[in-house]
Amino acid sequence: MKKLLGVLLAVAVLGTTLVSCSKKQSEAKASSDTKKIKIGVSIWSSTDTLGSQCKRIIDEAAKALDVQVMYVDQGHISENVTSSAETLSAAGCDGIIICNSASAEMTSVINTCTQNKVYCAQFFRIINQDTNPNEYALAAKSPYFVGAVHENEIENGEKLVTILAEKGNKKIALEGWEAGDATFLLRWQGYKQGVEKWNASHSNKIELLEPQYGGTTSDTGRSTAEAIINANPDIDALIVAGGGGDTLVGALAAIESMGKKGKIAVVSTDFLADLDEQLKTGGMAAESGGHYCDPLIAFMLVYNAIQGNYPVSTNGFYDVNFPYLYVASPEDYAAYAKYFVDALPYNAEELKAMAALSEKDLEIATAKLSIEDVKSRR
C-alpha cells in the first residue's frame, strides 16, 4: 500500500512539474512573440534644429507602431559613426537607421550589421556607385542592408545658387560642415553646376569661392563665417551648406555682429526654428529643407524588413528619393509652418497606414509629400 501511495505521489509531482514547465515555456513563447521591435538611430545630433525635428517624427512613428527606439548622437565624427553601429547592435536592436558622414564609414557599419543580423538603412545619404564602388558593392550584396533615403542634392545646390543669382548677388562664399561629407560633396557639385549654367547664359557673371568648414556647432559655424568675411570683405552672399542647423545659427550671429545683416544674402539647407523672422528681417534670403521626414521613410524600410514584409536583395537595395521644400518669403514659410511645424505632416493613423504600404507605394507616398499633400489629408 505504501509503495502504491509512493508511486501515485511521484506521478502527481511529475505531472505538476510537467504542467509547470509547459506553462513556463508557453509564457516564454508568448513573451518572445510579443517582444517589441527595437530600432536604433545613429544621428549627428538629436537636439539641434534638424535633428530634433527628425527625432520628433521618428518618436511619433515608434509610438504609433509600438516600437522601441534608441538614439546615438555621433557628431559626424567617423570613429563615432562606425562605433554607433556596434553600440546599437550590442544593445539588441533589430535594425538601425544611420546618417553617416563619409561613405567610407559604411564598410564598417554594413559589416557590423551583417555580422549581428541587424537590418540597416541610411537616411539623408546614399552610397555613390561611381565614387565608392567597393562600399556600394558591399551594400548591394548584404542581406541586411535594406536601402537608402536621400534627396537630390545636386539639384538642391543648383536651385540655391540660382536664387542668389536672380537676387543680383555676384560673389558667393561657401561654408560647409565636414570636408569629405558625402552630402556636402553633392551639394557642392550642384552649386558649381549652378554657377556654370548661370554664367553660360547671363552677362552678369557670378563667382563661387572655395569652401571653408564650420563643423556642426554654432561656435564653429560663427568663427568660420567671421574668418570667411574677414578674408573676403566684398562678398555679397554666403551659402551655409548644412550641418543640421547649428552651423547656420552661428554664421548668422557672426554676420549680424559684424554689421552685415541684410548686406550678405544667406541661403542654406535645414530650416531654422526662427526662419520666418530671419526672412522678414533680411537674415535669410532663402532656404531649402522640410526634409526631416526623410529618416521616417528609412525607419519604415527597416521596420518592414524586420517584419518580413520587404524582401532584402543580395543584388541591390531600395533607393528612395525624398523631395525638398523651398522657402524664399515669409508667406512661403507661413504655409510650411502650419503643416510641418505647428503639427506633424502625418498623424498616428496615417503612420500606421504608411507602415502597411508596399515598398513601391511607400516610394510614391514619399515623392508626393508637400504642403498641398498634407492639406489634402486634413
Feature roles, as predicted:
Residues 1-38, 111-116, 364, 373-378:
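Short, low-complexity disordered leader/linker segments with a strong preference
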Residues 35, 299-378:
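Hinge/cleft segment of the Venus flytrap/periplasmic-binding protein
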Residues 39, 43-45, 58, 146-202, ...:
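An alpha-beta-alpha
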Residues 40-42, 92-100, 119-124, 173-176, ...:
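Periplasmic-binding protein-like
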Residues 96, 101-115, 191, 214-277, ...:
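Hydrophobic alpha-helical
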Residues 111-155, 177, 276:
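Flexible loop/hinge segments that line or gate small-molecule binding clefts
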